[in-house]
Curated annotation (Swiss-Prot):
Residues 26-38 have a biased composition (Low complexity). It is a multi-pass membrane protein. Belongs to the TOC75 family. It is found in: Plastid, Chloroplast outer membrane. PANTHER family: BACTERIAL SURFACE ANTIGEN (D15) DOMAIN-CONTAINING PROTEIN (PTHR12815:SF42), SORTING AND ASSEMBLY MACHINERY SAMM50 PROTEIN FAMILY MEMBER (PTHR12815). Residues 1-31, 32-135 form a transit peptide. Residues 14-59 are annotated as: Disordered. Residues 157-164, 242-254, 373-417, 444-449, 481-507, 570-577, 702-713, 792-805 are cytoplasmic. It comes from Oryza sativa subsp. japonica. This is Protein TOC75, chloroplastic. Transmembrane regions consist mainly of membrane-spanning sided beta-sheets, which are not predicted by sequence analysis tools. InterPro entries: Bac_surfAg_D15 (IPR000184), D15-like (IPR039910).
């Protein structure tokens, strides 16, 4: 009786007695073993542990096979160098080759039985499970000579059960090759199916178990293991085989069987009558076809299916080697796309026109959160789960297939909360739902309250320019933070700073800020708005009132701002956000004696000071009060490619005066900044890959319509404006335009770069009250060019001031763009 269809099942079974099923009108001993992927998809350095693959019709043997397949995949992935640090945390999981086997086998022959046999399991699972034969590690250097005449063939049954045999040679002999048979080379995928290794030491029972595994795995029509006595006392082994072959197929179907329940099994009784056997096989056929119809289609794209069909058309019949190549090809696509838990667990409908490839894709069934203390003990966390859960990408939620890219994104998103010192995202098999994946997220929370004190010392020159003991001034900053209030990621941050703690009233500055995220509720994931309010007192040196390059140094003017700010930030995407709010502040201008300063001043040739400079405030009294609306739109698509910033960034800011305050100020200030980082050599992103060559293009425009106090005029010159000039050295104006270009060339894991920059006031300096650009003899425009090198966080640059034609060396911290 010929069978209409057959199936190959791959289960994580240890080698055991071979099972025989009736197929093709004869009794067939089915056996198969799995090979590692030939596409380098297995994690580097991961040991290829053996998995036995056997045919079975027992439901008990098939139960849990899909869970085992996923466990094997996750184990291999976790050992595959895909541990991603995130604030000290890591991401368990990675890509591997055929990451274990098992899973999904169901019937005895799957609707036709025979040939491929039965119970659930994994065709390739022997790579990661306990294998049939392992070298005795304790006695690997202590083995027994065979004690037989040299160069005679020795059946395994004739070996002594008391000896440990050293294997010096392993060969494969294909009986069907070339008509009379031929030895195959290491490139043959069958080489990877055995666990025996030359140089290993094995007992007779281990060798017999290896043979039984090969016999029972379904890959061979016939297989035998024979030894040859070597003169040095070792054994050479030859595996002679005839691979299994099925009829030609013209169609290929891929289904996801990950969460499908196991079918009820009925043992195939060899004592059945012919009619009972026929009824049994028909029932298996109906059950399997119903299973195929009820399965979800796999996510394998059409072009990969077409490639598999092309592989099938090149061969007249479906062979075990062809199925290995199909398995490798399918799993390679899954693993390359980040679906590291996907496993090919079965090929069904063999001996028909359509081959069915069953895949356990790694469906996520649930997400679990675990909090740990500093010692790794599980504790009750302070952070509310919805705060973390809303940061998970959609692809990492139940109902989706586990993907390592989604795991990386989850790490990045959760880390952006700044609530945890350690984050781990680990997939594991679901023990309650066979074939499912549980995403396990382990978190270590930061201390909610913290305080910090930092000190600094400054020396003020005394008489005759020499410092004295009394001129030493202690300064410092006291800061505190209470984060994650009520577990809702709300926080209060404060700091107090003074450069002279002996007389802190001279320059005491402070900031107190409250942040309230999820303004529309934690559960509303369609909106992400954060409310922030702060009160502040700051002091900065104004670059508006500085002397030009051909003047003596002008007396400095300090700008104090004390006020209140409240705004709402709405995140449209992780790259785009919109901030809008209200600012109320009092601005006071002071001279170096801390007295209120109403006008700028400059040194006269006589040594005196000219006090008729531009007014420092809009009111002319040295004190302004105003309220204005402020909005900011940021679109940042930059990313790090091997340590270099690539992408584009756009920032638009608008300040709108309300006519409230000193002299009823009404104005519109606007700024637009565009920066693009171009990957010139299209360097791909990846660990260990070199830095890309980068071209930076930058432009900045700012303008003001309406009332414009001098302290808010736009200045030209400085390390973040036009390099090579001092802060404000080129001018202060109502409108400015800056353009810059920088070419970065990677040299030994750092950058050497050249740049050119230009800035102009567009002729608007005269429109600033008192014209500080003219008063301080500045030109209103300037260019520079130079070369630089990055030394860690420091930029060393040689810059030519194009206005004066002189060059200067600068060292700066941070980035220009």
């Amino acid at each position: 009786m010929a069978l209409t269809s057959q199936s190959l099942f791959f289960s994580p079974l240890a080698a055991g007695p071979s099972r025989r099923v009736r197929g093709r009108g004869r009794s067939t001993s089915v056996s198969a073993a799995a090979s590692a992927s030939s596409h380098n998809s297995q994690p580097h350095g991961h040991p290829q542990q053996p998995l036995a693959v056997a045919s079975s019709s027992s439901k008990s043997e098939s139960k849990g096979s899909k869970t085992f397949a996923l466990a094997s995949a996750i184990t291999a992935a976790a050992s595959g160098a895909f541990l991603l640090a995130s604030s000290g945390g890591g991401f368990g999981g990675g890509a591997g080759g055929p990451l274990g086997g098992g899973g999904g086998g169901w019937g005895a022959g799957g609707g036709g039985g025979g040939g491929g046999g039965g119970g659930g399991g994994g065709f390739w699972s022997r790579i990661f499970s306990g294998g049939a034969a392992h070298a005795d590690e304790k006695s690997s250097g202590d083995w027994d000579p065979h004690g037989l005449p040299a160069n005679i063939n020795v059946p395994m049954t004739k070996l002594s059960g008391l000896k440990r045999y050293k294997i010096s040679e392993l060969k494969f002999f294909d009986r069907a090759a070339g008509g009379g048979g031929a030895f195959t080379g290491p490139e043959d995928s069958f080489f990877e199916m055995v666990t025996l290794q030359p140089g290993g030491v094995y007992t007779k029972s281990q060798l017999l178990k290896e043979l039984e595994t090969l016999v029972s795995c379904g890959m061979f029509e016939r297989v035998d293991l024979e030894g040859k006595a070597k003169p040095d006392g070792t054994l050479g082994l030859t595996v002679s085989f005839v691979e299994s072959v099925w009829s030609a197929a013209k169609q290929f179907k891929c289904i996801n069987v990950g969460l499908m329940s196991q079918s009820g099994q009925v043992d195939f009784d060899q004592d059945m009558t012919e009619r009972e056997k026929m009824d049994y096989l028909r029932k298996q056929e109906r059950d399997y076809q119903q299973r195929v119809r009820g399965a979800k289609p796999c996510i394998l794209p059409d072009n990969v299916r077409g490639e598999v069909l092309g592989m099938m058309k090149k061969q007249e019949k479906v062979s075990a080697r062809l199925l290995q190549r199909i398995r490798d090809h399918v799993q390679k696509w899954y693993h390359n796309e980040g679906f590291v838990c996907a496993q090919v667990v079965n090929f069904g409908n063999l001996n028909t026109s359509e081959v069915v490839c069953e895949v356990v894709e790694g469906d996520i069934t649930k997400v679990e959160y675990q909090f740990q203390d500093k010692l790794g003990n599980f504790v009750e966390g302070n952070t509310q789960i919805p705060i973390i859960d809303r940061e998970l990408p959609q692809q990492l939620r139940p109902g989706h297939i586990f993907n390592i890219g989604a795991g990386k994104q989850a790490l990045k998103n959760i880390n952006s909360l700044a609530l945890f010192s350690n984050i781990e995202v680990n997939p594991r098999p679901d023990e309650t739902k066979e074939g499912g994946i549980v995403v396990e997220i382990k978190l270590k929370e930061l201390e909610p309250k913290s305080a910090e004190v930092s000190t600094e010392w400054s020396i003020v020159p005394g008489r005759e320019g020499r410092p004295t003991l009394a001129s030493i001034q202690p300064g410092g900053t006291v800061s505190f933070e209470h984060r994650n209030i009520y577990g809702l990621n709300r926080s209060i941050v404060g700091s107090v700073t003074s450069s002279n703690l002996l007389n802190p009233q001279d320059d005491l500055s402070f900031k107190l800020e409250y942040v309230h995220p999820y303004l529309d509720g934690v559960d509303d994931r369609n909106k992400n708005r954060t409310f922030k309010t702060s009160c502040f007192n700051t002091r900065k040196l104004s670059p508006v009132f500085v002397a030009g390059p051909n003047m003596d140094e002008a007396p400095p003017v300090w700008v104090d701002r004390v006020g209140f700010k409240a705004n709402i930030t709405e995140s449209f995407t992780r790259q785009s956000k919109f901030t809008y709010g209200l600012v109320v502040e009092e601005i006071t201008t002071r001279d170096e004696t801390n007295s209120i300063c109403t006008h700028g001043s400059r040194a006269m040739p006589s040594g005196g000071l000219s006090m008729d400079g531009p007014p420092t405030t809009l009111s002319g009294t040295g004190i302004d009060r105003m309220a204005f609306l402020q909005a900011n739109i940021t679109r940042d698509n930059t990313e790090f490619v091997n340590g270099a910033v690539i992408g584009d960034r756009c920032i638009f800011q608008l300040d709108q005066g309300l006519g409230i305050g000193s002299k009823n100020p009404f104005f519109n200030r606007h700024q637009l900044t565009l920066t693009k980082f171009v990957n010139l050599n299209k360097q791909e992103k990846g660990a260990g890959k070199p830095l890309p060559a980068v071209l930076v293009l930058h432009g900045h425009y700012a303008g003001c319509v309406g009332d414009l106090p001098s302290y808010d005029a736009f200045t030209l010159g400085g390390p973040y404006s036009v390099r090579g000039y001092g802060m404000g050295e080129l001018g202060a104006s109502r409108n400015v335009l800056e353009v810059a270009s920088e070419l970065r060339i990677p040299v030994r894991n750092t950058y050497v770069y050249g740049f050119v920059e230009h800035g102009t006031d567009l002729g608007s300096s005269k429109d600033v009250k008192g014209n500080p650009t003219e008063f301080f003899r500045r030109v209103g425009h300037g260019s520079s060019y130079g070369l630089g090198v990055k030394l860690g966080l420091v930029r060393g640059e040689y810059i030519v001031d194009h206005n004066a034609g002189t060059g200067t060396v600068f060292f700066r911290f941070g980035e220009r763009f």
